[in-house]
Design a protein with these regions (language model features):
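ALDH superfamily catalytic-core signature
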Residues: 1-110, 161
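Conserved C-terminal structural/oligomerization subdomain of aldehyde/semialdehyde dehydrogenase
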Residues: 97-229
């Protein structure tokens, strides 16, 4: 006899982070690093990083160096990102692999990060809308209006303002352990009223909050092990 059992399961979703032109650079770097590296295989680690083009040299170049050399993350990027790091490769640093169109639609759940430079918040929102569904959306900004617009317009299960995507979880919200993150918008049975036609989007406002333990560079761990030996 065949029995059918209903199940509740996690579905595919991409997590994005956007770094605005008005931002606290050290805090934003920590948020991005924590969002990707704290547990790279997790569903709420970021897959795509969008950076406002004006922040390429003051923010992005140093961040990519850290991702490649300190944390051993594979970085793939848009042509502008590849060009930026191509100049760095000439000085002895590792290079960035060009991203394909398919890469912007991938949920990696691995130590891989796709990076794209965007002109402004408009382009960032358009990219996220065109490469979904979006599981977690992070914005790093010091601009209140940009934070509010991003939170309002991005279609994601959760928006983290100046906080790590890794905090998008039951225990991150103080609700206790969860079994997954759901992207479905309609889960109702029986009479359908206004309440059944609405769904929730979590918005968390932070000031650089991270999920602990915060990642330690592999080079630092290697040095500690050598010292102990």
């Amino acid at each position: 006899m065949l029995f059918r059992s209903p199940i509740l399961c996690y579905d595919y979703g991409i997590s994005h982070a956007y770094v605005d032109g008005d931002v606290d650079i050290p805090s934003a770097q920590n948020v991005v690093i924590n969002s990707k590296i704290q547990h790279a295989a997790s569903t709420n680690s970021i897959d795509t990083l969008l950076v406002q083009q004006s922040m390429a040299r003051p923010f992005l170049a140093a961040l990519i160096r850290r991702l490649l050399e300190e944390y051993k993350i594979q970085v793939i990027g848009c042509p502008k990102t590849v060009a930026l790091m191509g100049q760095m490769a000439m000085t002895g640093h590792e290079a960035v692999t060009p991203a394909t169109e398919e890469d912007w639609h991938r949920q990696f759940q691995a130590p891989i990060l796709a990076i794209k430079m965007v002109a402004d918040l408009d382009e960032a929102l358009a990219h996220i809308a065109g490469h979904g569904p979006c599981l977690t959306a992070v914005i790093a900004t010091s601009d209140y209006n940009a934070a509010m617009r991003f939170s309002r317009e991005v279609d994601a299960t959760a928006v983290m303002v100046n906080a790590s995507s890794r905090l998008n979880s039951g225990d991150g919200y103080g609700m206790g352990p969860d079994i997954g993150l759901n992207l479905s918008k309609v889960q109702t049975r029986g009479p359908i009223g206004l309440e059944q036609l609405t769904n929730e989007k979590y918005v968390a406002f932070g000031a650089g909050q991270l999920r602990h333990p915060h990642p330690v560079p592999e080079t630092y761990e290697d040095a500690i092990m050598l010292k102990r030996a």
